[in-house]
Amino acid sequence: MELKALDIINKFEALNKLADKETDLSTAIIIAKNLKELSTYKEIITKKRDIIIIKYAERNDDDVVVRDENGNVKITDVDGFNKDISEILDTIIEVNLLLLPKDKMMDMKISAKDILPLTDILDGEL
């Protein structure tokens, strides 16, 4: 399955929330395998994002990254930063994800926001 990097991040976060829910063994294994498959790509995406943040970070006279009052890194060239981040998040990556058995997850409590990134890997009618 081909996914954009942004979709990998969203699926990883949604699966991570599912991983805390109680389910049958086979579904738990599928969730765990999918998390493992996505985690490597998520780490690579995060490292590339961090490199871009450092590239565009504002620095003081001592070459220390400047942060705002909330602890966020101040960016010097917002347009360049957004362009580079968008390029990373739009990158297409081939991943091998297993389908989640919808019928085994019917008793799970999950928000629409959390299930949305997973709808294309649900096995069964919606």
Features from the language model and the residues they span:
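N-terminal interaction modules that seed assembly of large macromolecular complexes
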Residues: 2-57
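Low-complexity intrinsically disordered segments
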Residues: 43-126
